Amino acid sequence: MADILHRIGIKSTSIEDVYRALTTREGLASWWTSNTHGEGNQVGNIIEFRFGAGGFDIKVTELNPPTHVLWEVAEGPEEWIGTTISFELKQDGDYIIILFKHMNWKEPVEFMHHCSTKWAIFLMSLKSLIETGKGTPDPIDVKIDNWN
């Protein structure tokens, strides 16, 4: 099994604002993909994320407001199905630190390399959303290769 790991600091004193950006349709659509359907604020909910060429459905499996969000990929690209996505939040001075994990990839295929870079880009979009009020979700995100 292989994992994608990132750490990012968001200059904010409101961990609740970051948590809401991870658990509401409005929040998710403002930093990840504007084509988001469903709410992530209850365990068991399914959130549908769509991008230009495809997308995936994610089940909310754990919530510990305002410090932890855990998802499991239910539908989507074969490499993503069964993987889990975790956001751990903690206050550290003037920053909210996010420890991000996209876990349990069966193997480190080329698509995982692409997704690792895209996760970094979307986490920077989340940072921008909280710090400036404007994120860069798909379709206005940074395009990195011919897969998007």
Annotate each PLM feature.
Residues 104-148:
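A conserved amphipathic terminal alpha-helix motif
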